[in-house]
Curated annotation (Swiss-Prot):
Its EC number is 6.3.2.9. This is UDP-N-acetylmuramoylalanine--D-glutamate ligase. Belongs to the MurCDEF family. It comes from Borreliella burgdorferi (strain ZS7). GO terms for biological process: cell division; cell wall organization; peptidoglycan biosynthetic process; regulation of cell shape.
Length: 451
C-alpha cells in the first residue's frame, strides 16, 4: 500500500482507547483523506478526551461505541486493531485484512530502527538509548509501547536518523517481516499468561524482533538466550549480555563488573552506577554507544546522571523523612523482587504495598525478599489472593486493605524516619484503576497529600 492510496480505502479502527495510540493512528489516516469507522466497547463518555482530539475530522468519522457491529468488520477494506485485542477475537474473522498501528507505520517508514522488547525494563532502556543517541543523531525519535505512537511523528522523520521503538509481545505478534538494524531483548519472565495460551507462544512473539533481521546486531540477555532463543535462527550477529556473571559458552558477550564494561573479556569503558535496578539498561546503552561509535565519556555522564522515569521505581518525595517510591509499572512478581532488592537497606526498612489483578502468574519469587521486607501491606484483588497464600505458607504477617488510600495511610502511620514505602504491585491494575499509570498517579497524589 502507498501513502496516496489511503484516501481510497475504508478503515475500521478497533479500539480508540484512552492512551493516545488510537488517536494518533486515526489522525494519521484522516489527514490523508481516509474514511473511518471507529469502534470501541467503551462508551462515548469514557472516551470523551479521545473523541475531542478528533473533532477537526468529524465529517470523516462514524463512531460505533459500547459495542461492535459485525457488518463494520465485513465492509472495511482494512481493520486496524489495538494490539491488546487477541488475534482469535470473534469479530476479526470477518476482516478482509488486519493491521496494527505499528505494522501500518512500518509500511511507510524509511528510518533505520533500533527495536527493544523484553518482559521488563523496556521503557527505561529506550529512554536511555534516546538520550545517548541524541548526542550523535539529533533527529532521533522514540515511540512505540512507551506511550507514543510513531505515527504521531511520521511527518517529522528525515529518512536517515535512528528511530527507537519499544515493542511489546502483542505489537510484535503481527510483524512478519520486521527488519531493524539493532534488536534488543532485555529479559524474559512469565507474563501475560491471561493473554497467551502458553509460554511458548509468548516466546515466539518476542522472537519476531530479530528472526527476519538481515543486517546489524541482535542483543539478548545471556540467560534468556540459553533458555529460550538459541533455537531461533538469526541471520545476523548475536551478542549476549550479562548483568554480572556471563554464561560459560562460546558466544560474543558483554557484561558489567563494578561499573566497568567488558566485551569478549576486553575493557571498553566504565560508568558510575548507584542503583542496581538500572544496571541492565545502562550497560546495554553503553554497549550500543560503543557499537555506534558514540562518545563513551558523554554516554557515561548520561548514565551516571540518570534518575529513572515516571512509574518505574520513581522517587516521589520524603514525608517526615519517610521515603516514598512509585513502582506501579512493576506488574509481575519478578520486577517487584528486583525493585525491593535495589532499595535494600542494612536494617531492612522497606514497607511494601503490593497486590492487584491476577495475570495467571505465581508469586513464588516473593520468597527471595521475605527477609528484606519489614511490613507487607496488601491491596485487595484477584492476584492478592495468591499473594496471601504465599505469605501465610511462610507464616508472614500482612495487612489487607480495600483501597490504595487506606494502604498508603497505614504505610505512613507505621513508618519511622528513615523507612522506605515502596508501591510495587506485582500485579495488573484493572479491578480498581484504569491502567497502571492511573494507579501510579493516584499513589503520587495520595503521597503528596500526606504533608
Amino acid at each position: 500500500m502507498l501513502l496516496d492510496e489511503i484516501k481510497n480505502l475504508n478503515f475500521l479502527i478497533m479500539g480508540l482507547g484512552l492512551n493516545g495510540g488510537g488517536v494518533a493512528l486515526s489522525r494519521f489516516l484522516l489527514k490523508r483523506g481516509a474514511k473511518l469507522v471507529i469502534t470501541d466497547l467503551k462508551s462515548e463518555t469514557e472516551l470523551a478526551l479521545s473523541i475531542d482530539a478528533l473533532r477537526d475530522f468529524e465529517d470523516q468519522i462514524r463512531y460505533v461505541l459500547g459495542k461492535h457491529d459485525v457488518n463494520d468488520f465485513k465492509n472495511a477494506d482494512i481493520v486496524v486493531k489495538n494490539p491488546g485485542v487477541k488475534p482469535n477475537n470473534k469479530y476479526l474473522k470477518f476482516a478482509k485484512r488486519i493491521e496494527t498501528d505499528i505494522s501500518l507505520f512500518l509500511m511507510f517508514n524509511k528510518n533505520p530502527i533500533v527495536a527493544v522488547t523484553g518482559t521488563k525494563g523496556k521503557s527505561t532502556l529506550v529512554s536511555l538509548l534516546y538520550q545517548a543517541l541524541k548526542e550523535k543523531y539529533p533527529g532521533v525519535k522514540l515511540g512505540g509501547n512507551i506511550g507514543v505512537s510513531p505515527l504521531s511523528f511520521f511527518d517529522q522523520l528525515d529518512g536517515k536518523s535512528p528511530l527507537i521503538l519499544e515493542l511489546s509481545s502483542w505489537q510484535l505478534q503481527s510483524l512478519e517481516n520486521f527488519n531493524p538494524i539493532i534488536s534488543i531483548i532485555t529479559n524474559v519472565y512469565n507474563d501475560h499468561q491471561n493473554y497467551y495460551l502458553n509460554f511458548d507462544d509468548y516466546i515466539i512473539d518476542k522472537s519476531k524482533i530479530f528472526v527476519n533481521q538481515t543486517s546489524g546486531i541482535v542483543i539478548i540477555q545471556d540467560q534468556a538466550y540459553c533458555k529460550y532463543f538459541s533455537k531461533f535462527k538469526s541471520k545476523v550477529r548475536v551478542i549476549l549480555f550479562s548483568e554480572f556473571n556471563p554464561c560459560d559458552f562460546d558466544q560474543d558477550i558483554f557484561y558489567c563488573n563494578e561499573g566497568k564494561v567488558y566485551f569478549n573479556g576486553n575493557l571498553i569503558g566504565s560508568f558510575s552506577n548507584s542503583r542496581a535496578v538500572f544496571i541492565i539498561p545502562k550497560v546495554i546503552t553503553f554497549f550500543v554507544s560503543y557499537y555506534l561509535n558514540i562518545d563513551l565519556n558523554r554516554t557515561g555522564q548520561i548514565l551516571s546522571n540518570f534518575k529513572g522515569i515516571e512509574h518505574r521505581l520513581e522517587f516521589v518525595k520524603s514525608v517526615q523523612n519517610v521515603m516514598f517510591y512509585n513502582d506501579t509499572a512493576s506488574t509481575i512478581p519478578e520486577s517487584t523482587v528486583l525493585s525491593v532488592k535495589s532499595l535494600k537497606t542494612k536494617d531492612n526498612r522497606i514497607n511494601l504495598i503490593v497486590g492487584g489483578t491476577d495475570k495467571e502468574l505465581d508469586f513464588l519469587s516473593f520468597s527471595k525478599i521475605a527477609d528484606i521486607v519489614r511490613t507487607w501491606i496488601l491491596i485487595r484483588g484477584s492476584a492478592t489472593v495468591k499473594i496471601i497464600k504465599i505469605l501465610e505458607k511462610s507464616s508472614i504477617q500482612y495487612f489487607l486493605f480495600d483501597s490504595l488510600r487506606d494502604a498508603v495511610n497505614y504505610a505512613f502511620k507505621i513508618s519511622s524516619p528513615g523507612d522506605i514505602v515502596l508501591f510495587s504491585p506485582a500485579s495488573a491494575s484493572f479491578e480498581l484503576f484504569n491502567n497502571e499509570f492511573d494507579r501510579g498517579l493516584q499513589f503520587k497524589n495520595l503521597v503528596n497529600n500526606l504533608g
